Amino acid sequence: MATAALVRPLELGADIVVLSTTKFYTGNGAAIGGAIVDGGSFDWTVERDGESVFPLFTTPDPAYHGLKYADLGAPAFALRARAGLLRDTGAAISPFNAWVALQGIDTLALRVEKHNANAKKVAEFLATHDKVAKVNYAGLEGSPYKATQEKLGLKYTGSVLSFDIAGDQDDKTAAWKFIDALKPVSYTHLTLPTICSV
């Protein structure tokens, strides 16, 4: 779960970034949306054994008078997404959802900072708990992921973590006991019903 306030994938070598604006960007999950960010650096003309690896970009599109998207250069992916996926599915964010997402961007940096501070406290607590065998969180000293955070020069590691419950990994009793004791929470004004199904 990353945002541009946490990490900038294009600067780290990614060619295309797909993100959800529903999660961190809105700040409250009140809008549904997403984005595709094209760095414009990917070579869509690559061939293997004389065949195009990406035929949707290199073969003529009859819907657009034989246009070959790869011939357009840097904007090839973004234009293919608009001219194909968006045209065929209508997957455009509504004006209201766009407005709600924009409201959340004002406080994004502050929220990311707080999310990370809270996640680190939870990870540190779990790391010392006798019923936890292992915590997977790059913000912990000694984490095998810490070196990656430092190599990338990231101030934060994100607010998502996982952990393994202590005990025999083949005996799932402790895991089911933990799962059965969980109570779903909501971080918005919304409430969850008493009985939730996954």
Residue positions per predicted region:
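Conserved PLP-enzyme active-site core in the AAT-like
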Residues: 1-131, 136
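Conserved small-domain helix->loop->beta segment predominantly found in fold-type I
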Residues: 89-92, 96-98, 107, 113-114, ...
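Non-catalytic surface loops within mature trypsin-like serine protease
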Residues: 38-40, 165-167, 194
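N-terminal start-of-domain structural block
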Residues: 9, 13-17, 141-147, 188
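Conserved small/polar residues in nucleotide/adenosyl-binding loops
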Residues: 188-194
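Glycine-rich phosphate/pyrophosphate-binding loop
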Residues: 197-198
